[in-house]
């Protein structure tokens, strides 16, 4: 139900917002390196992450357990990584080139926000199960990670975020990698 509600939220707003962005020339600046086919994508409205994150946040607030610390940590990570992406896209539009935030700046902020979120999870854990590695098909087996939970979790959060960013690197249009990423994570979370 929450997925359907997020989709309806997107469908309700997406056309109006994309048309407004086209009028204001909020289009993707394409790198000159790479295949010529990517140049055709120049001018495609950018900052779609705002729509996707808006739908996710809306759905979480409507259907999530607002008493759960996990929901609020999820919203913190989504919002903070979304802010990094927004700033990156904003700088690209402002400067009219494909250079946004530097890679080092992005990684610094991603690691910083992930460290904050994971530290809260680790230090507020009520049981060792909360900081254990549980394999989807072998739920009876769990590996207690101790302090390594922090390092592994940061690696997974930053790595997952950058899996999409690096995949869409040439043209900056991340919808298909995002769909695949979200689908895979959704399946694992469901198990």
Whereabouts are the PLM-identified features?
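"…together with the soluble PPM/PP2C metallo-phosphatase catalytic core" -> "…together
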Residues: 1-191
């Amino acid at each position: 139900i929450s997925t359907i509600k997020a989709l309806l939220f997107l469908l309700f707003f997406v056309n109006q917002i994309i048309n407004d962005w086209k009028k204001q020339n909020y289009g993707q600046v394409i790198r000159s390196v790479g295949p010529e086919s990517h140049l055709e994508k120049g001018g495609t409205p950018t900052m779609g992450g705002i729509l996707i994150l808006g739908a996710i946040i809306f759905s979480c607030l409507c259907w999530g357990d607002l008493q759960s610390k996990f929901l609020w940590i999820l919203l913190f990570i989504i919002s903070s990584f979304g802010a990094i992406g927004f700033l990156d896209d904003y700088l690209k539009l402002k400067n009219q080139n494909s250079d946004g935030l530097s890679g080092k700046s992005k990684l610094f902020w991603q690691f910083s926000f992930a460290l904050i979120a994971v530290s809260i999870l680790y230090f507020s854990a009520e049981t060792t199960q909360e900081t254990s590695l549980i394999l989807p098909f072998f739920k009876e087996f769990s590996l207690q990670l101790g302090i390594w939970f922090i390092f592994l979790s940061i690696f997974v959060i930053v790595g997952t975020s950058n899996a999409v960013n690096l995949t869409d690197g040439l043209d900056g249009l991340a919808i298909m990698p995002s769909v695949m990423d979200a689908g895979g994570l959704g399946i694992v979370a469901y198990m």
